[in-house]
């Protein structure tokens, strides 16, 4: 798995889907999000209660969004 991708559940990042799923199941069925980088650029959302996987955006869209945000911050400084 690419190190830029992390699973996110309720403020916590996990390197593996299994860890994230276990945490989500113990956290009242919260969604597991596949994110790009340290930011909440969600690519996929997994709903443990319904076991449904939903695409939020593509990897390229997430990368472009992060790049735009980075460029905005550089311009402001």
Locations of the language-model features?
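Short intrinsically disordered terminal tails
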Residues: 1-4, 61, 68-77
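A subset of signal/propeptide-processing and intrinsically disordered low-complexity segments
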Residues: 2, 17, 42, 64-66
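Short aromatic-glycine-(Arg/Gly/Cys) micro-motifs in beta-strand/loop hairpins
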Residues: 1-10, 26-51
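Repeat-associated, polar segments at repeat-unit boundaries in modular proteins
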Residues: 53-55, 62
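A short, exposed loop/beta-hairpin motif centered on an aromatic-Gly-Thr core
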Residues: 8-18
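Intrinsically disordered, low-complexity coil/linker segments enriched for acidic/polar
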Residues: 16, 58-60
């Amino acid at each position: 798995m690419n190190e830029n991708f992390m699973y996110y559940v309720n403020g916590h990042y996990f390197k593996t889907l299994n860890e994230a799923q276990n945490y989500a199941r113990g956290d009242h069925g919260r969604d597991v999000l596949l994110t790009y980088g340290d930011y909440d650029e969600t690519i996929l959302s997994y709903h443990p209660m319904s076991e449904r996987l939903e695409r939020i955006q593509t990897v390229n869209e997430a990368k472009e969004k992060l790049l735009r945000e980075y460029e905005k911050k550089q311009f402001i400084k």
